[in-house]
Amino acid sequence: MTNEELKKIVGRNVRKYRLLYNAYNKEKLTQKDLASKIGAKTPLIGALESDNNNMGVSIYNLYMISKVLNVPIEKFF
C-alpha cells in the first residue's frame, strides 16, 4: 500500500464515521464543527475527507477525531 492509498483510506473513513455519527446523533457535526472540536482549522477536515487528499493527518489529530466521533482509532485504517 502506498502513502497516497493510505491517506485516501483514512480520509474516506473519517468522512464515513462523521456521517454515521450524524445519522445517530441529534448534534450534527459539519467539517467545521469537527475541526473546532479537535482544535484544527476547517480546511484540514475538508482536505482529509477529499479524494484529492495530499495533506495527510497527524496521529494526534486522528486520535482526537476518533474521540469526538467515539470510534476506535484503528477503524480509520
Name each model feature, range by range.
Residues 1-27:
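A short, Lys/Arg-rich alpha-helix, primarily the initiator
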Residues 12, 47, 67:
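DNA-binding alpha-helical recognition surfaces that contact promoter or target DNA
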Residues 24-48:
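Short alpha-helical DNA-recognition segment
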Residues 30, 58-61, 72:
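Residues that mark the N-terminal boundary/hinge immediately upstream of a DNA-recognition element
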Residues 52-64:
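Short, basic-rich loop-to-helix N-cap that marks the start of a DNA-contacting helix
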Residues 70-77:
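Short C-terminal boundary/hinge segments that cap the last helix of small helical domains
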